[in-house]
Amino acid sequence: ILYGCGDAAMLDAGGLAVVGSRNVGDTLVEYTERIGRLVAEAGCSLISGGARGIDRAAMRGALEAGGQALGVLADSLERAVLNRENRDVLLENRLVLISPFDPLAIFNVGYAMYRNKLIYALADAALVVSSDYEKGGTWAGAVEQLERGRFVPVYVRVDEETGRVMEALQRKGALPWPNPDTPEALRELLTSRVSPKKTT
């Protein structure tokens, strides 16, 4: 069972899943908002978990650029649906909010871990912007997808600041994010159907 609000057709649309840490600095927030804007410009959907930090930055970037976003929530669906910030874009059929849990459910770590499967399953590809090392929901969700789920290719942000977290995910089969800088390049990435890397 999925509870939700918005245009259910968006659940079949695919798109780019963007995930990451809750506690991040302004530089990563701005980076993630740019990714969201690019997804919107490409005419694709942005899929994320709706949590503070990277998730909301990605969704905000897409929606403010006139695009579509799909939030897979671990808790408080009713509150999110009634939030004034979400109301207009829900009515415009540009935002869908869903949850596998009761709309009144409060936050639970297990719920957050479980909903990660849906984020990946609804996407054509996924980008991990940031993560803690060997702990937290972003790490657990990415590792589960790489080692067991393998629904879609998992990309990781790679630059001079990413360090051992992204290197560790690449060893598990993640791909370096190629930083597409045009809508056409992003669409090509999402439709190329790259097979998820298999670890040995």
Residue ranges: model-predicted function:
Residues 1-200:
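Glycine-biased, small-residue-rich flexible motifs in mid-sequence functional cores and linkers
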